[in-house]
């Protein structure tokens, strides 16, 4: 068994979406002064590698704390998108030998995570084509994951991809940190923090093969 960590490390310098407060990690106790260590955390529900709940964009969509735990685990196919390809196309999803009927999650490996921490990470990243989105909506997936800041373009006015996927009751995982050479198939886990009215949550996403 091998476990692949698909998560970015959180710290005070974690990149955030424009207009979003930066996370704060502050040491509030030390062994020298208090006999123990403790850290104060302040961050939004969509910081770092995280899940979008249907409630994030759908008025009556389910919150993370309303979803069964089973939705956060399942069989995943890693879809390799050619380097610097601006569009994730339907044929890229169908290119593998895995039957989509056996898949719970599609994880899109575009390589964009290499720009994590730079300004380029927020601009011109690959997004789904209309055909790829239609294929996803036609299947009964639990969720879809991206190694980019958002499923939609940075200047999207209607958040069509978000609204379409979340509107079907699926979850979206963003800011995945998918490593080179990862197998095309594995068991995916992305459990969120448990808190009330959760529109999203940071996760420790892993793929087990």
Segments the model singles out, each with a brief description of its role:
Residues 1-209:
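Active-/binding-site microenvironments in catalytic and ligand-binding cores
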């Amino acid at each position: 068994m091998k476990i692949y960590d698909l998560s970015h490390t959180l710290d005070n310098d974690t990149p955030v979406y424009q207009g979003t407060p930066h996370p704060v990690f502050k040491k509030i106790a030390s062994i020298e002064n208090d006999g123990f260590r403790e850290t104060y955390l302040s961050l939004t529900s969509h910081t770092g590698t995280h899940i979008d709940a249907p409630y994030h964009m759908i008025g009556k969509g389910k919150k993370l704390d309303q979803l069964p735990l089973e939705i956060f685990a399942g069989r995943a196919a890693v879809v390799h998108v050619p380097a610097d390809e601006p569009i994730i196309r339907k044929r890229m999803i169908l290119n593998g030998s895995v039957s989509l009927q056996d898949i719970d999650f599609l994880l899109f490996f575009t390589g964009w995570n290499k720009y994590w921490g730079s300004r380029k990470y927020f601009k011109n990243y690959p997004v789904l084509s209309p055909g790829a989105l239609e294929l996803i909506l036609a299947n009964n997936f639990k969720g879809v994951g991206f190694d980019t800041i958002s499923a939609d373009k940075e200047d999207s006015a209607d958040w069509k991809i978000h609204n379409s996927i979340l509107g079907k009751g699926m979850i979206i995982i963003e800011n995945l940190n998918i490593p080179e050479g990862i197998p095309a198939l594995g068991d995916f886990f992305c459990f969120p923090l448990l808190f009330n009215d959760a529109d999203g949550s940071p996760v420790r996403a892993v793929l087990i093969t």
